[in-house]
């Protein structure tokens, strides 16, 4: 940790002895076939166990592995870190406030994830298909060890458990969860675009997002959330 290096304060550092003991106990108490699995599980547990640990590079070596070659060791080396994601939430069916509260709790309960901040919920008119009830919308900020596709899969599962049915595009829904930002990633795939491709056009996303991240910059257009909201409001 940089602060420990600048202040020489032990309390600002990660306790190396505790980390070493944790690794030793993990290796003793777990059995896996692949080094890759050992590395992934150990790093994930370390990041969740030790507060202030943001990124880990880990190498696991296996001496004299049976690979049919005169090698002293084979190894797996990985780097994993916490990521920051912003999620938009919406509902216009059932008890929407309870549904959104439950969704926040479900996201916070995900393994390898922590909800850090939640906006208030706002009531907004429907977008696209207008012949339907008003929506309740909000946004949250979370830390996660999931990669984008993994996070999307978990959000889709939470939607489904809340009764989400994908029948009418932009139609009524019990729960809608969208990844708006994921770090400063720019990615466009058939099933997932980050940042969300329509976010700059949607006041129901920008208004609650501005409450928790006014100065977060869009990695594509360079504008802050507040700037995008002001431009949309003025248009």
What positions do the PLM features span?
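N-terminal, polar/charged subdomain of small-to-medium soluble alpha/beta proteins
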Residues: 1-85
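Flexible, gly/pro- and Lys/Arg-enriched active-site loops
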Residues: 2-3, 8-9, 127-134, 146-152, ...
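Hydrophobic C-terminal alpha-helix "anchor/cap" residues
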Residues: 42, 46-47, 107-108, 155
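Extended accessory regions or peripheral subdomains of proteins
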Residues: 84-104
